[in-house]
A protein has these predicted regions:
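Short, surface-exposed secondary-structure junctions/capping segments
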Residues: 133, 396-397
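Generic N-terminal targeting/processing segments that precede catalytic cores or assembly contacts
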Residues: 1-177, 181-183
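A structural signal for small-residue-enriched, beta-sheet-centric alpha/beta enzyme cores
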Residues: 2, 7, 14, 20, ...
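Short, amphipathic C-terminal "tail helix"
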Residues: 362-394
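Short, low-complexity, polar/charged sequence segments that are solvent-exposed and flexible
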Residues: 62-65, 88-90, 108, 132-135, ...
Length: 397
């Protein structure tokens, strides 16, 4: 494949291609081998992004009845746990038209059936792009596979029935490192992608996952959900507040966008629970809390410290602090000052949330640190948490 690059934050990063593109290339190559009865070393795949890829084919084998081969995933410079895995396709002749737990493509006298084998997940929850009980092969990869195999069939004048089986031997193990089990994909990974390409360090991939989780919560009947930025928040919810994490959606640094998406998915209430190191930024109106976007943590603590009575020396010491915990420790040198400051920080964070969400969705927030526990909460946070936990979870199972 000819390498493609994009520049992000002054870094030159290499594009990759999706599991869906791997499945497409492997299926096309297997179909070619079945008809030619010869090994295939490369195939050209057209992606929805308009980029043609020349991909290497591995582990080829064939008989007169079937052909099998693999294409290895290359995620480029994107930190993807599926990078390097082999995606296999087995294409075989079929004479029957029995239903399978897969997908069917018919055009004239041609019938293609796409099924999943080892390591490809099965959808177990509604709200995904695939029906419950079907293989987790999303619509765009499905169409790519069908159109590329159909092209081969037309090339050889084939009219009849073929079965296309995608399998990924490492899929079940790798899926444990992904969001798949949480989103309702069991037993393996998905064939994903809308463009056929992997954009390095793509924010869209993360926000798409957040939107999908919010959508699943909504269609399962939840009107109120918890947002939390990361692992600290999930641990605090589970260990300190005894919250089942099925009520929560991890929003990473995308607090503003997550609130927008919750509104769009008709969620009625959102409780944001997060570590002070993240959510103190929200008190300054920072809606993307990634360190590369903005900071302002010490400035926020120092400003409210001054507003609540801290002297000039203490303000300067707070500004020179490296961590939020250091800043809080300095505030604690004055009795009652930390509590006053955090009351204002929580109020401002809550106000910024409410402003972003608008009138159609209620918002509350809870700030904590691992060392100090809850630092503060907005007025309705406790009651909102009770309402969230009172919701029926059976449709999420």
């Amino acid at each position: 494949m000819e390498e493609m690059y994009v520049y992000k934050n002054q870094q030159k990063l290499r594009w990759g291609y999706t599991t869906g593109t791997c499945g497409t290339a492997a299926s096309m190559a297997a179909a070619l081998m079945l008809f030619r009865q010869k090994r295939v070393s490369h195939v050209k795949v057209s992606t929805p992004k308009g980029i043609d890829l020349d991909l290497e084919i591995e582990e080829t084998r064939f008989t007169k009845e079937q052909a099998v081969c693999a294409v290895r995933k290359d995620s480029g410079d994107d930190p993807d746990v599926t990078n390097g895995i082999a995606v296999y396709s087995r294409v075989s002749f079929r004479n029957d038209k029995q239903e399978t737990e897969g997908y069917i493509w018919e055009n004239g006298g041609l019938c293609l059936r796409l099924t999943a084998g080892e390591g490809v997940g099965t959808v177990t929850k509604p709200g995904l792009a695939c029906e419950v009980g079907k293989p987790a092969i999303n619509p765009v990869p499905r169409e790519m596979i069908f159109t590329h195999v159909e092209k081969v069939c037309k090339q050889y004048g084939f009219q009849g029935s073929l079965n296309i089986e995608i399998f990924i031997p490492q899929g079940a193990e790798i899926s444990k490192k992904t969001f798949n089990p949480r989103m309702g994909i069991k037993g393996g990974i998905s064939l994903l992608g809308t463009s056929g390409m992997v954009e390095p360090m793509s924010e869209k991939a993360l926000t798409d996952t957040i939107r999908l989780e919010l959508h699943q919560k909504h269609i399962a009947g939840l009107k109120s959900v918890i947002l939390t930025p990361g692992n600290y928040g999930e641990s605090f919810l589970r260990d300190e507040l005894d919250v089942n994490l099925d009520y929560a959606v991890k929003c990473s640094n995308y607090i503003g966008e997550s609130l927008d998406m919750a509104v769009q998915e008709n969620i009625e209430e959102v409780l944001l629970v997060g570590h002070g190191g993240k959510l103190i930024k929200l008190a300054a109106g920072v809606m993307n809390t990634h360190s590369s976007v903005a900071d302002g943590r010490m400035e926020t603590l120092a400003a409210w410290g001054g507003a609540c009575g801290a002297g000039e020396k203490l303000i300067r010491e707070i500004l020179e602090s490296v961590t939020v915990d250091q800043g809080l420790k300095l505030l604690e040198t004055v009795p009652g000052l930390r509590e006053k400051v955090m009351e204002q920080v929580v109020r401002r964070a809550w106000e910024h949330m409410a402003l972003r969400a608008g009138e159609s969705m209620k918002t509350e927030c809870i700030l904590f640190t691992n060392e100090r526990g809850i630092l503060g909460m907005s007025p309705g946070a406790r009651d909102m948490l009770k309402r969230i936990l009172a919701q029926d979870m059976t449709k999420l199972d």
